[in-house]
Amino acid sequence: VERKQPDLVLIVARSFATKLATPTLITDARGDLVYFNDAAAELLGRSYLDIGELPVSRWQELFEPRTLDEEPLTPEQTPSGIALLERRPAHGSFAFRGLDGRDHEITVTAFPLLSRPDEVVGVMSIFWEPPAGP
């Protein structure tokens, strides 16, 4: 099986993400997880070096994304899925379980990564846990 070289836009996005203190993850044009930074690792419960790249079905299974009302979310319903499928930025909140067993509620802003105006090569998702209420 021949593996396609990553698009330059994904390479630059990964380089940018490594420098951010905000949790950031990158998916490719299929929705597969191709990178997340150290800040994201703190919420996800494992480092990128431990996990590596994951197909969309596997990372959905591992992290169990769900609405804040505990309803399961499909990949297409998450901000990153919306950004990929609709080729537009998306913002929202949802919950997931980290690989360390801790549950998190996060707010996410995701935007498509374009190599040309008509070609989405991936999505960058920046997320954070909102501060606890009073």
For each feature predicted by the language model, list its residue ranges.
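Terminal output helix/cap of sensory domains in signal transduction proteins
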Residues: 12, 51-98
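N-terminal capping loop/helix in small sensory signaling domains highlighted by a polar->aromatic N-x2-3-F motif
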Residues: 37-41
